[in-house]
Design a protein with these regions (language model features):
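Short aromatic-glycine-(Arg/Gly/Cys) micro-motifs in beta-strand/loop hairpins
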Residues: 1-23
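A short, charged, amphipathic alpha-helix used as a generic interaction element across diverse proteins
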Residues: 28-52
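Generic hydrophobic secondary-structure signal
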Residues: 1, 5-7, 27, 41, ...
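Generic structural motif
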Residues: 10-12, 30, 73, 96
Length: 113
C-alpha cells in the first residue's frame, strides 16, 4: 500500500483532551521517506517553515512518532502581560492498509398508486 504522515492536534482549551486529525500527508518512497518527512514536519510545519514568533519543543516518542508543543505569546487589549497560547501535535508515520470508498446510499423509491 502507501505511506502517510498523520498530524493530530490538541489545542487544550479548558482541559479538553480531544485530538483531531488535521492532516494526512501522502509520501512516495516508502517508510524511510515517510519518516524523513514526518521529522521535517515536526521541526518546521506542514508548509515547511517555522514562524519566527513561535516556540517549539519536539519530542521523538518512538522511531515513527513525535510529540510537538508549539507556543506563542499573545497580547490581549485588556491585559498588560502577554498570555502564552500552547498547541500540541502528534505526528506519526502510518502505512495505509485498507482503502474502501463509502457505499452509495440506495435511491429512494417513489411509489405510485
Amino acid at each position: 500500500m502507501s505511506w502517510y504522515v498523520l498530524v493530530e492536534a490538541n489545542e487544550s482549551y479548558g482541559g479538553d483532551n480531544t485530538w483531531d486529525l488535521v492532516a494526512k500527508v501522502p509520501v512516495e518512497g516508502g517508510q524511510a521517506a515517510a519518516i524523513a518527512r514526518a521529522e521535517e514536519i515536526s521541526r518546521t510545519s506542514l508548509s515547511g517553515s517555522l514562524p519566527e514568533e513561535e516556540g517549539r519543543l519536539v519530542f521523538r516518542t518512538s522511531p515513527t512518532s513525535w510529540l510537538v508543543e508549539k507556543s506563542r505569546l499573545v497580547r490581549h487589549e485588556r491585559s498588560a502581560e502577554p498570555t502564552e497560547h500552547t498547541q500540541h501535535l502528534r505526528i506519526s508515520v502510518a502505512e495505509l492498509v485498507l482503502a474502501r470508498e463509502p457505499a452509495v446510499p440506495p435511491k429512494k423509491r417513489l411509489f405510485h398508486r
